[in-house]
Amino acid sequence: MKHFLLSVFILLLSCSQKTSLYAQPKIKVVVLAERGEIHESFVATALEWLKAYNKKSKLEYTIITNADTITSTFLADHKLFIQLNYPPYRWSDKAKAAFEDYIDNGKGAWIGFHHAALLGEFDGFAMWDWFSDFLGGIRFKNYVASRVDGEVYIEDKKHPIFHKLPSHFNLPKEEWYTFDKNPRANTHVLANVDENSYKPSTTIKMGDHPVIWTNPKKKAKNIYFLFGHHGGLFDSKEFTKLFANTIEWSIKTK
C-alpha cells in the first residue's frame, strides 16, 4: 500500500511539473493612459485596480502614456488595447494607421473610456475622422461640468459584459458627455443613462443618451464607456464588475 501511495505521489508531482513547464503564456495588454491631466484621479485608480485584478488573471500590461510607440509591430504583440482617457489626438499618422488596421482587421480588442471620445478640433489638432466613424460618426458637443449622479439602464441584457449585473445601477458624480448626434444609428448601444435621474438636475442633455456601445462593423471586439471622469467610480461594485467582465470578454477567443 505504501509503495502504491508513493507511486501515486510521484506521478502527481511529475504531472504538476510538466504543467508548470508548459504553462500558458500571459496575455499581453497595452494600456494607453492619459497622465497628469484632469482625469488623473480615474487613470491612477484604474491602474491600481488593473494591478490588483491581475493577481487573479493571466495578463501582462504594457503601460504607455503617449501614442509614440504605437506601430503595427508593437500592437501585434498585444491582444487587448485599453484606452484610459487618452484622447483621439496627439497621434502620429503612423500610430493612427497601425491602430486603424488593428481594429478594422480584428488583430486585437479595444476598451475605451470617457475622454477617448473627445472628438473635434482640440489643442490645434484636426479631428480624426476614422475614430469619429468608429464611435458612431459623433463629434463632442458638451459635458456636465458640475458632475451629477445618473441611473444607467442596460439595453442588451444578454451581452457578456453585463454578466451578474442588475438591469440598472447608479453611477455617482459623473461628467456625462453629449455629442452632436446620437451614435445609436451607427453602433449597437448596450446601455443608456436616464437623464431624468440626474441628481442634481442639469439642462445639459441629449434626450436618448447612450453611454455604453460597440461598433459591430469592426472585426475587433470593442466597447466604449462614456463615463470615467474620476477615481470614485471604482467604489462602485457595479462598475468594477462591468470593467472585469469587459476585459474577460475582450480577451476570450471568439
Go through each PLM region and give its residues.
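Proline-centered loop/turn at the N-terminus of a beta-strand
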Residues: 28, 109-111, 188, 221
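Extracellular ligand-binding/catalytic regions of CAZymes and related secreted enzymes
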Residues: 24-27, 55-56, 65, 76, ...
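Helical hinge/lid and interdomain linker segments adjacent to catalytic or ligand-binding clefts
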Residues: 30-119
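Bacterial Sec-dependent N-terminal signal peptides
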Residues: 1-26
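Catalytic beta-strand/loop cores that center a nucleophilic Ser/Cys/Thr
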Residues: 143-218
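Extracytoplasmic/secreted proteins, especially bacterial periplasmic and envelope-associated proteins
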Residues: 45, 49, 94, 98, ...
